[in-house]
Amino acid sequence: NVGLRGYGGNARSWMQLKPELPQMADEKGIIFVCPDGKNSWYWDSPENPAYRYETFVTSELVKYTDGNYATIPDRKARAISGLSMGGHGALWSAIRHKDVFGAAGSMSGGVDIRPFPQNWEMSKQLGEFAANKASWDAHTVVNQLDKIVNGDLALIIDCGEADFFLEVNKDLHNRLLARKIDHDFITRPGGHTGTYWNNSIDVSPGSVLLLSA
């Protein structure tokens, strides 16, 4: 399982959030890989050629992991999950590379970036919103759903009721329903916080770890 962290984090963010993750992974026989995606939003940036994080996550990282660890090198045994920016990245990566991943989970994911054009350095990767609306449209998760049909991916989406990303997650949920794509959609009390994400791993562990079990 690939675990993508949020904006401003680092490769140790998941371990700091949930120190029990290694034990949970051992109990389930899962390899949990936590890359550092900088503040890339896990795109191959059209503005910054040095930021090719979609390629890194979906190709280079997978090949390295399969080549150096005792994995099952099959999409059915591979999941990707993330929180916040990483939730966007997990869904973006899995939907666009369903040949690589069989499951994806998002916690508090920024699944539609367009309502937030001034935030989280996204303009460094896509250009300023006003002058690059087509690029922003093309780089948001909710506009990728034509790439999958029901059964392509196991999907779980989790977002707190006080989270500023709640409405875009509800929109994603409704779009998936309209396309008759099966998925789990979970909302609970809580915001865009470490406490919520820590509890999510216990309440809905499939969104992070056990989806691939």
Range-by-range predicted roles:
Residues 1-213:
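Non-catalytic cap/lid and distal C-terminal segments of serine-dependent acyl enzymes
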